[in-house]
From Swiss-Prot:
Coiled coil: none annotated. This is Argininosuccinate synthase. Its EC number is 6.3.4.5. The gene is argG. One of its GO terms (molecular function) is argininosuccinate synthase activity. It is found in: Cytoplasm. Pathway: Amino-acid biosynthesis; L-arginine biosynthesis; L-arginine from L-ornithine and carbamoyl phosphate: step 2/3. L-citrulline binds at residues 89, 125, 129, 177, 186, 262, 274. GO terms for biological process: argininosuccinate metabolic process; L-arginine biosynthetic process; urea cycle. InterPro entries: Arginosuc_syn_C, Arginosuc_syn_N, Arginosuc_synth, Arginosuc_synth_CS, Arginosuc_synth_type_1_subfam, AS_cat/multimer_dom_body, Rossmann-like_a/b/a_fold. It holds the Pfam family Arginosuc_syn_C. L-aspartate binds at residues 121, 125-126. It catalyses: L-citrulline + L-aspartate + ATP = 2-(N(omega)-L-arginino)succinate + AMP + diphosphate + H(+).
């Protein structure tokens, strides 16, 4: 008896997920494989991918256009949270996993599948993100992970696929593992496994080399409503169009590259290269607008929430009770985060040069040092005395002979 009768497989068209199809059938006795490819704005023609799944042995090959949901329900929530894992990675790949997991669970219910499957290996974070998200959405649904168990090297996996007529797009001269969606690209493996090796320029697609960027700066005004980006230079765009347009405008100036040593959930360090032009600039601009519209204590407290939030998303806990509780707090903080942020794009730098909001808590009359100054300077002496009283009492007890 096989491990499952009918399986919905998360499918990308790559080597691992393509090999999963014959492997599930011939090694694990699965009777029917349904593949699901999610269109998250990765730029691939999905009809050839759908056809490749059928050619690889799938009975049904599905394509789900999930771009709008991806941006509105996942990316925008992360922007409101200023989510940066280890203060650098904007979770462009990690954010896609809970959405794909939801699509798998929904497809399994629709087609009566008794299991879902993915092509993640046992070393990465994605296996955790898929398995935990699926368990949160349907704890009774079986999850199969062939690549985690088959014990084949990359070369052996390619050879196995070739036995079943599956061509490999990976060339010896380009051994990188690449994941892409509308939010960005992640690149790893091959020469990048040496943390001292400088990445070749050829691995970058969304961002221009600094030497090739324009010699004049470009300015973009990003409009936010309740923490959600809604416009560029005063023109409203749909969520998908806004990200797409901003990616192009930011990337041409060489902005959005990340080269980092990352601490994976499974306990190992990994060298990762990311491109996320729009997402990084939006988080940068959003955080600046918060500094204008939130009180100091809320803003400071939210910083700690943001770190926890980022770890939860990175660690596959998008659907966890704690994540939902943090969502409620973050949404409350965003009610007044509306306004416009002006960003200067030039030679790899995105510099905030202006911000404005009808909800601004900045008072020019209180902040100025000019004649218009309305701050009561005489009040400072009493404030300083009360503020410093605990320190003064401590000093009298400890330092006084």
């Amino acid at each position: 008896m096989g491990r499952a009768k009918k399986v919905v497989l998360a499918y990308s068209g790559g080597v691992d997920t393509s090999v999963c199809i014959p492997y599930l059938k011939h090694e694990w006795g699965v009777e029917e494989v349904i593949t699901l490819a999610a269109d998250l704005g990765q730029g691939d023609e999905l009809e050839p991918i759908r056809q490749k799944a059928l050619n690889s042995g799938a009975e049904i090959s599905l394509v789900a256009d999930a771009k709008d949901s991806f941006i509105k329900e996942y990316a925008f929530a992360a922007i409101q949270a200023n989510a940066l894992y280890e203060n650098r990675y904007p979770l462009s790949t990690a954010l896609a996993r809970p959405l794909i997991a939801k699509l798998l669970v929904d497809a399994a219910a629709e087609y009566g599948a008794d299991a879902v499957a993915h092509g993640c290996t046992g070393k990465g974070n994605d296996q955790v993100r898929f398995d935990v998200s699926i368990a949160a959405l349907n704890p009774n649904l079986k999850v199969l992970a062939p690549a985690r168990e088959w014990g084949m090297s990359r070369e052996q996996t390619i050879a196995y696929g070739e036995r079943y007529g599956i061509p490999s797009p990976v060339k010896k001269s380009s051994p990188y593992s690449i994941d892409r969606n509308l939010l960005g690209r992640s690149i790893e493996a091959g020469p990048l496994e040496d943390p001292w090796t400088e990445p070749l320029e050829e691995i970058y697609v969304m961002t221009q080399a600094i030497a090739d960027t324009p010699n004049s700066p470009e300015y973009v005004e990003i409009g936010f409503e309740r923490g959600i980006p809604v416009s560029l230079d005063g023109v409203a765009f749909s969520p998908v169009d806004l990200i797409d347009r901003l990616n192009q405008r930011v990337g041409i100036h060489g902005i959005g590259r990340i080269d980092m040593i990352e601490n994976r959930l499974v306990g190992i360090k990994s060298r990762e290269i990311y491109e996320a032009p729009a997402l990084l600039v939006l988080i940068h601009a959003h955080r600046d607008l918060e500094s204008l519209t939130l009180t100091g204590d809320v803003s400071q407290y939210k910083r700690g929430i943001e770190e926890t939030y980022s770890k939860l998303v990175y660690n596959g806990l998008w659907y966890s009770p704690l994540k939902e509780a943090l969502d409620a707090f973050i949404q409350q903080t965003q009610q007044r985060v509306s306004g416009t942020v002006r960003v200067k794009l030039f030679k790899g730098n995105a510099t905030i040069v202006g911000r404005k909001s009808a909800n601004s808590l900045y008072s020019p009359d209180l902040a100025t040092y000019g004649a218009e100054d309305q701050f009561d300077h005489k009040a400072a002496e009493g404030f300083i005395y009360v503020w410093g009283l605990p320190t003064r009492v401590w000093s009298q007890q400890v330092r006084t002979p």
